């Protein structure tokens, strides 16, 4: 409604949980030029096992389908993420699943962190932080390196183009 009644006002979603980013929302974003073609989707992990332990409300496959819908409806949409390396019980395979998801999406940029307990959270109360810090740091470094590669690819696609931007404080 705001996009329609205020066509000169640029609008941007700040963050959306993947399960809340419906086809209806994507269709509205596609329809109105004053809605920024940018979506922040905090996936956290590319492993279904870890997503379940995190109590996330989506699976890897649902997330990938959402990405496919975004790319189909809004081809030049920027997509960013949150990713956590070394969540309790994360295996090498879980980490490889995360790197594989990153290769599938090729995010424009992301917010990447090594897991650390936050007092009062379910994870702090119920899950032992059993991934050693050196492994967390190594995995985080791999995630950051991959993101830098993807950011460079995505940024180069805009060379020579004029685009409308939203500058925030």
Language-model features: where?
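Short, electropositive alpha-helical surface patch
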Residues: 1-3, 23-37, 90-108, 130-138, ...
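Conserved SAM/AdoMet-binding glycine-rich loop
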Residues: 1-92
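A short acidic, helix-capping loop that chelates divalent metal ions and anchors anionic groups
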Residues: 48-53, 120-126
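Generic alpha-helical structural signal
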Residues: 64, 68, 96, 137-144
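Internal alpha/beta loop-helix hairpins
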Residues: 111-116
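Terminal RNA-binding accessory module
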Residues: 125-169
């Amino acid at each position: 409604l705001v996009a329609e009644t205020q066509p000169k006002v640029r609008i941007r979603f700040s963050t959306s949980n993947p399960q809340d980013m419906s086809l209806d929302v994507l269709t509205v974003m596609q329809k109105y030029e004053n809605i920024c073609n940018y979506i922040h989707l905090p996936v956290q992990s590319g492993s279904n096992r870890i997503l379940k332990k995190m109590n996330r409300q989506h699976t890897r496959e649902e997330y990938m389908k959402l990405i496919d819908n975004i790319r189909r409806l809004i081809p030049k949409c920027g997509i960013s993420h949150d990713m956590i390396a070394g969540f309790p019980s994360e295996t090498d395979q879980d980490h490889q699943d995360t790197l594989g998801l990153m290769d599938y999406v090729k995010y424009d940029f992301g917010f990447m962190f090594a897991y650390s307990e936050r007092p009062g959270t379910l994870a702090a109360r119920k899950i032992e932080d059993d991934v050693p810090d050196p492994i967390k740091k190594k995995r985080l470094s791999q995630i950051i390196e991959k993101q830098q590669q993807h950011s460079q690819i995505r940024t180069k696609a805009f060379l020579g183009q004029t685009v409308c931007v939203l500058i925030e404080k």
